[in-house]
Structures are given as C-alpha cells and as structure tokens.
Regions:
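Pre-NBD coupling/linker segments of ABC/ABC-like ATPases
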Residues: 1-49, 240-277
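H-loop/switch region of ABC-family ATPase nucleotide-binding domains
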Residues: 213-214
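A short, surface-exposed alpha-helical micro-motif characterized by mixed small hydrophobic
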Residues: 219-221
Length: 281
C-alpha cells in the first residue's frame, strides 16, 4: 500500500521535543490479592517506571506512529505529551497553540451530556466559546449521535464515545493531534468516514500527529516515521517499513514462543493424566 507521506517541510521546525523522560507509578508490577493486602497494610508500594529516559523529536507537519506490545508505555507516552501525566524526570516541550488527545476513556465528564462535553472539551483545548459554537452543528452532525447528544456521556457505548471524541478533534482541528487507538472503535461506516477525515487532517503540513495503533497496515500508510517502545524504552525509531518489519518479526517470535509453550503444557497435562490412569488401573 502506498504511504500517505507529506511533502518535505522546507525548514526543519520541531513541534514536539521529549528529553530524557521518566514517568513512574506507585503500585504493583504483578497483581495478587496477597501482595495487594500486604502493601495496603504496610503502606509500601513498589515504584513502577513506565517510561525510562525516553528522548525524541517530532518535526512540525510530520506523522509519528508509536508501536509496542501491551504495557510498553505507548499510552503513557501520549498522556504525558498531552499534559495528563507530569514528568518525574526530563521534559516535554510543545510548539503548538492547541493540542488534543483522542483516547477512549479520557477527556469527558460522564455526568454531562454530549453537548455539554463538546463545549467543555473545546475550552480545554484552548478554543473560545464563540469559536466552539461556530463549529457546534458541524461536530454534532459529524458524530451521527442524533438526539443522544443531549444524553449523559456515561450512557454512551464505546462506539458512541469514540464518535464524539473524534468529531470534536476533527472539526476543531488542533495544531497537534495525539491519537490512541480511537480509529479502531465504532461501526464500519463511521470508521471509513473518520479514516477519510483523518487523512484529510494529517495532509495539512502545519499539523503534527502522533498515532498509537496495533494496525501496522494503518501506520505504514499514514506515518512518516515509527517509534518502537519496549518496556518503557525506545527500541528503534526511523523509517516506517524498516521499523515495522523488525517489530512484526519480534511480535511473531513472541506468538511462536507462546504457542510452543502452550503445546508443551498440553503435552505435560496429557502425560500426567496417563500416569494417573496407569496408577489407578
């Protein structure tokens, strides 16, 4: 599939600078009821480092894709850029007037209606009430929510939530867009419409986009570069095809090892059953 790569920006201008970023959580690396109760009793929790000295830049007008297996720090990275998480060490510098994060479960007040959340979200993105009201009907129409726009967001399905979140960002058009798997949610018709709108938005050479997705096909088509995160660190960054090919090899190896371990476990169970049957005979 041919990539939708933007034209080169004449002068290199940096939109996002991440330098030696560390993000830490207090919690349990591996959950167990016994450990959890013990930590609650003693008041001591382990420190889990979600991001470990991550540094990279994104040029203005470029599209960066982020990949990595579950728990590698992808969503933490986006939330840090969006300002939801503060760095424990390091820094994040943004060179854009407005920034938006598209992610299921982030950004809306559940008790408020979809309509009210449009106003609130727009203000949080840095737009004036007049600017939001100018685009209000377009946002509602694009969302396809109809009268549900006047219902509390807590009553929405994940697909409805995704439609509203995407519509707000797509119509208000921020300078920096952060997208966390949101294009994978919703009905087929809306997916096609939102994907077409996304391609239109990212073709603007003044807009910088960072996308987290498990779809390597989508990333190959849309992105200029790929950042591969592994256990909170950068494993590789560079050309889309080169990085994604290496990443796919890595994931295939993990899947093959998992399948091999499963077969070994099944064989051990069969042997144990046969041994028990022989003993009982």
């Amino acid at each position: 599939m041919k990539k939708n790569v933007k034209k080169n920006v004449e002068k290199k201008e940096i939109s996002i600078t991440v330098k030696d970023l560390h993000i830490r959580y207090r919690g349990l690396k591996k959950f167990s009821i016994k450990k959890s109760l013990l930590k609650m009793k003693t008041g001591r929790f382990e420190i889990f480092e979600a991001l470990k000295g991550v540094s990279f830049e994104v040029e203005k007008g470029k599209i960066l894709g982020i990949v990595g297996k579950n728990g590698s720090g992808k969503s933490t990275m986006l939330r840090s850029i969006a300002g939801i998480f503060c760095p424990d060490e390091g820094s994040i510098d943004l060179h854009g007037h407005t920034i938006s994060l598209l992610s299921i479960g982030v950004g809306f007040q559940p008790a408020l209606t979809g309509y009210e959340n449009i106003i609130l979200s727009g203000m949080l993105l840095g737009f004036s009430e007049d600017q939001i009201k100018e685009k209000l009907n377009d946002i509602i129409e694009f969302s396809e929510l109809g009268d549900f726009i006047y219902s509390p967001v807590k009553t929405y399905s994940s697909g409805m939530y995704s439609k509203l979140a995407f519509s707000i960002t797509a119509i208000l058009e921020t300078d920096i867009m952060l997208i966390d798997e949101v294009l994978s949610v919703g009905d087929i018709q809306f997916k096609a419409k939102s994907y077409a709108k996304m391609k239109e938005l990212i073709n603007d050479e003044n807009r910088t986009v960072v996308i987290v997705s498990h779809s390597t096909e989508t990333l190959r088509e849309l992105c200029d570069e790929i950042l591969w995160l592994h256990e909170g660190e950068i494993k590789m960054k560079g050309d889309c095809d080169e990085v994604l090919d290496k990443y796919q090899e890595f994931m295939d190896a993990i899947a093959a090892k998992r399948e091999e371990d499963k077969k070994k476990e099944e064989e051990e169970v069969k042997k144990a059953i046969k041994a028990q049957e022989k003993k009982s005979a």
